[in-house]
């Protein structure tokens, strides 16, 4: 049995990983453990990649799982607009690495203002929408789209995309 360790205990990230494994028809054991991402509380741009990779590396070290998976949400200024997205990074115990990126979405200026004042995206969302702990539920994307797209949905596709070379290598003996 293959064990995949997620570098988080956030229920949205755990449920998105479970759904991705279901989509891939993989009966792998999943464990979620909180690990350090080594970046700022609110990652910006390249820090998002670094944070996701650090989560994958750190969780595989502490669990000795077959696969370490890190998911990191971040914000970046692109052409004068602030966008949010997530990076999913996977590492096998043999050292194979891959990553994928979620869809990006622009943030309203009210959120950007709070983020630039030092708030995390989830905190900014909670303040603006008068919610609590939205990052463990629908996330900013769910609040902004009235749950047409929620945080779990945003994560499933990049988890699948990050895992496909590992899945193909392990199951189908197809080299990456």
Swiss-Prot record:
GO MF, one annotated term: nucleotide binding
Annotated positions binding Mg(2+): 36
Claim: Manganese is one of the keywords in the record: yes
GO annotation, biological process: nucleotide metabolic process; thiamine metabolic process
TM stretches of this protein: none
Cofactor note: Binds 1 divalent metal cation per subunit; can use either Mg(2+) or Mn(2+).
Reaction it catalyzes: XTP + H2O = XDP + phosphate + H(+); ITP + H2O = IDP + phosphate + H(+)
Cofactor: Mg(2+); Mn(2+)
Gene3D superfamilies given in the database record: 3.90.950.10
Enzymatic class: hydrolase
Keywords from the UniProt entry: Hydrolase, Magnesium, Manganese, Metal-binding, Nucleotide metabolism, Nucleotide-binding
Quaternary structure and interacting proteins, as annotated: Homodimer.
Recorded family membership: Belongs to the YjjX NTPase family.
Protein name: Probable inosine/xanthosine triphosphatase
Organism: Saccharolobus islandicus (strain M.14.25 / Kamchatka #1)
């Amino acid at each position: 049995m293959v064990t995949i360790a997620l570098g988080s205990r956030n229920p949205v990230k755990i449920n998105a990983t479970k759904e991705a494994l279901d989509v891939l028809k993989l009966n792998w054991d999943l464990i979620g453990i909180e690990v350090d991402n080594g970046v700022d509380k609110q990652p910006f741009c390249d820090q998002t990649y670094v944070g996701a990779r650090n989560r994958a590396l750190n969780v595989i070290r502490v669990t000795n799982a077959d696969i370490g998976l890190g998911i990191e949400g971040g914000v970046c200024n692109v052409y004068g607009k602030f966008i949010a997205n997530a990076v999913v990074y996977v590492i096998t115990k043999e050292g194979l690495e891959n990553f994928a990126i979620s869809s990006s979405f622009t943030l309203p200026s009210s959120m950007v203002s709070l983020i630039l004042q030092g708030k995390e995206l989830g905190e900014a969302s909670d303040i603006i929408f008068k919610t609590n702990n939205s990052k463990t539920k629908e996330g900013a994307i769910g609040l902004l789209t009235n749950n047409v797209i929620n945080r779990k949905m945003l994560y499933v596709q990049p988890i699948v995309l990050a895992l496909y070379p590992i899945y193909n290598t392990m199951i189908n003996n197809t080299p990456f």
